[in-house]
Regions:
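Flexible, glycine-/charge-rich segments associated with ATP-binding catalytic modules
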Residues: 43-45, 49-54, 161-226
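Accessory, usually C-terminal, subdomains that scaffold auxiliary metal cofactors
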Residues: 139-141, 148, 160-166
């Protein structure tokens, strides 16, 4: 959920709300946060963080790691799309996820009503984990005009292809991910407010009742690598 933390920090900075960051006590966790780029995010928000400096491994970055970074266009999500293409992910799932990422790059300013979202990606234990997040208005606000009356309903509508816009090409990204996970495996979660919809090969399940509410939207996808 590194991308959602970055989006949260960015939104608080934009609102002029003071941010206090307490670095983890575990040295390995501090280095992991630095390697994933959280120090840069906190630096940009002018937050004192105490995270260590690390040297980037460019070869690793190109094939197995995308640091937390802001995006607001298709071009900005190119690094995340590239890591999907590099790994041995089932072609159908690869196409679906790449399409959803590109759609997110285009749509965050329109749908979320914020200038940018945040993304991150990493290969761990033969799985590729991707996260995109924004601290915008949330899925319910976006889809109220399309008939959504609850966060849970809005998330299900989004995963089944409903878009805020009437354009037939809109809203296909999340639906394609759901369909491809059903065929090729993996799992995904779309989170907004206090609600979550999870995607797995055999099930699409939505529920409300998160102990904390996230003001915005998070997409977290885990893809199997063959």
């Amino acid at each position: 959920m590194m991308a959602s933390l970055a989006a949260f920090v960015d939104s608080r900075r934009a609102a002029g709300i003071p941010i206090k960051f307490v670095p983890p006590g575990d040295r390995d966790v501090r280095y992991y946060l630095s390697r994933m780029g959280m120090g840069k995010v906190l630096d940009a928000a002018e937050v004192n963080h105490g995270l260590p400096s690390v040297n980037a491994n460019m070869a690793l970055t190109q094939r197995a790691l995308v640091e937390v970074a802001a995006f607001s266009s298709e071009d900005d999500v190119a690094a995340l799309v590239s890591i999907v293409s590099y790994q041995s992910v089932a072609p159908g799932l690869q196409r679906a996820v790449s399409r959803a990422l590109l759609e997110a790059g285009c749509n965050v300013p329109e749908h979320a009503r914020v200038p940018r979202g945040f993304m991150a990606g990493q290969v761990i234990n033969n799985q590729l984990r991707l996260s995109v997040a924004d601290a915008g208005v949330g899925v319910l606000s976006t889809l109220e005009g399309s008939g959504a009356t609850s966060e849970k309903q809005a998330l299900l509508m989004a995963v089944n292809g409903t878009s805020e816009f009437a354009d037939a090409d809109r809203g296909r990204g999340l639906k394609s991910i759901h369909e491809s996970i059903s065929t090729h495996g993996g799992r995904g979660a779309l989170i907004s407010g206090q609600s979550v919809v999870t995607m797995s090969p055999n099930r699409l399940f939505a529920w409300t009742g998160n102990s904390s509410s996230y003001a915005g939207t998070i997409l977290d996808v885990v893809l199997p690598i063959s």
